[in-house]
Curated annotation (Swiss-Prot):
Subcellular location: Secreted
Encoding gene (name): Gdf10
Record protein name field: Growth/differentiation factor 10
Distribution of this protein across tissues and organs: Costa, costicartilage, femur, calvaria, trachea, aorta and brain. Predominantly in the cerebellum.
InterPro entries membership: BMP3/BMP3B, Cystine-knot_cytokine, TGF-b_C, TGF-beta-rel, TGFb_CS
Species of provenance: Rattus norvegicus
Keywords noted in UniProt: Cleavage on pair of basic residues, Cytokine, Disulfide bond, Glycoprotein, Growth factor, Osteogenesis, Secreted, Signal
Propeptide: 30-366
Recorded GO MF terms: cytokine activity; growth factor activity
């Protein structure tokens, strides 16, 4: 054989062995395989997505100190996603989160969940169990064994065995124990090569538990090995998210039912004229007489100065929210005013909202400059002003707007009058039938508002309330 052909043949035989020679260089046959955790895996891309869930970032900063846990961060991002896209969360209007309480039973961690804060009107759509999967305990990597042969050496890599699979077990706690409760479901999990957050659909488990009235559940991640009983960090505690559709959220006064935390009628403070032993009436009491501000939604005293002591007699002492509009008091001399300022300020004993006279004067001046025809007026609601800021996480305030103005004949098209409102305004203008009021300026189109708040059990809840902000007004 020619020398050139021999060199080409030898080169073609040695070329496949180049990677193996590089592996064995410097350590012979005793070189160890890199650990599993250092090898690239397909889960790395999933890990990058999970990092968004693990790192609080700006979302946690919005929650303030003491609330920067993974559950609150996850819920805040759902809230921000709704505000950004406008799509209902999970296809419904309610998302409830439930934190776990850790206990160690038989040297194994068991997580308890109390789901009793779910309302009967909330129809469950889906439920997910979120947990942090610890990195598996891999067996030690085997060495590389090489068997020399006559012409070339062949080496075989012995990969480590796979770790044991995890079993996620759910039980109801009708017996108040984790090991004797009714088995609700179990699923096998393959631990990922690296620690990351995972989510599993447990809709059937939650729906069955609610149908049976057993909303105290336990979850256990069983690997077959005894745990040392060392609790995991609170940032890695599992939690449950329940996506639901609240069928009662469009009912009247639904926002107060879910967000109000105290009785608007203080204990021991009775309605005028009510019997001492009469039971409290949860309905809103309204005055029999109707004052002019209730007809055109304008602030009282906009057109005329009210009488000093008779202006507030049309209202009960305590409506659901007492009227924030106080009558203007007669002007006092400078000496009397100075003497009044020197008096000691005594805070009001009532929990009902009250605004000072200067605020009302500014509001009236703004309305004097606004058009008299029915239109949308600006109104910003701050939850701190009504005492709800202690449990509402976001938003702190929102633009509610309101409708006010006259619906006089002839009504322009800009006020979008209904046919009935048009006929009513004509009958009033003709004056054949006495006592016919003007059509009312009311909201026509309204927008929803997502509210992130803490329920009575300090669980973070996201609800999308309809008809919270006025978009357009019309005469009706």
């Amino acid at each position: 054989m020619a020398p050139g052909l021999a060199r080409i043949s030898l080169r073609s035989q040695l070329l496949p062995l180049v990677p193996l020679l590089l592996l064995l260089r410097g350590a012979g046959c005793g070189h160890r395989v890199p650990s599993w955790s250092s090898l690239p895996s397909a889960a790395d891309s999933v890990q990058r997505d999970r990092d968004l869930q693990q790192s609080p970032g700006d979302a946690a900063a919005a929650l303030g100190p003491g609330a920067q846990d993974i559950v609150a961060v996850h819920m805040l991002r759902l809230y921000e996603k709704y505000n950004r896209r406008g799509a209902p969360p999970g296809g419904g209007n309610t998302v409830r989160s439930f934190r776990a309480r850790l206990d160690v039973i038989d040297q194994k961690p068991v997580y308890f969940f109390n789901l009793t804060s779910m309302q009967d009107s909330e129809m469950i759509l889906t439920a997910t169990f979120h947990f942090y999967s610890e990195p598996p305990r891999w067996p030690r990597a085997r060495e590389v064994f090489c068997k020399p042969r006559a012409k070339n050496a062949s080496c075989r890599l012995l990969t480590p065995g796979l770790p044991a699979r995890l079993h996620l077990i759910f039980r109801s706690l009708s017996q108040n124990t984790a090991t004797q409760g009714l088995l609700r479901g179990a699923m096998a999990l393959t631990p990922p090569p690296r620690g990351l957050w995972q989510a599993k659909d447990i809709s059937s488990i939650i729906k069955a538990a609610r149908r049976d009235g057993e909303l105290l559940l336990s979850a256990q991640l069983d690997s077959g090995e005894k745990d040392l009983g060392v609790p995991r960090p609170s940032s890695h505690m599992p939690y449950i998210l329940v996506y639901a559709n609240d069928l009662a959220i469009s009912e009247p006064n639904s926002v107060a039912v879910t967000l109000q935390r105290y009785d608007p009628f203080p204990a021991g403070d009775f309605e005028p004229g009510a019997a001492p032993n009469s039971s409290a009436d949860p309905r809103v009491r309204r005055a029999a007489q109707v004052s002019k501000p209730l007809q055109d939604n304008e602030l009282p005293g906009l057109d005329e100065r009210p009488a000093p002591a008779l202006h507030a007699q049309h209202f009960h002492k305590h409506e659901f929210w007492s009227s924030p509009f106080r009558a203007l008091k007669p002007r006092t001399g400078r000496k009397d005013r100075k003497k009044k300022d020197q008096d000691t300020f005594t805070p009001s004993s009532s929990q009902v909202l009250d605004f000072d006279e200067k605020t009302m004067q500014k509001a009236r001046r703004r309305q004097w400059d606004e058009p008299r025809v029915c239109s949308r007026r600006y109104l910003k609601v701050d939850f701190a002003d009504i005492g709800w800021n202690e449990w509402i996480i976001s938003p702190k305030s929102f633009d509610a707007y309101y409708c006010a103005g006259a619906c006089e004949f002839p009504m322009p098209k800009i006020v979008r009058p209904s046919n009935h409102a048009t006929i009513q305004s004509i009958v009033r203008a003709v004056g054949i039938v006495p006592g016919i009021p003007e059509p009312c300026c009311v909201p026509d189109k309204m927008n929803s508002l997502g509210v992130l708040f803490l329920d009575e059990n300090r669980n973070v809840v996201l609800k999308v309330y309809p008809n919270m902000s006025v978009e357009t007004c019309a005469c009706r």
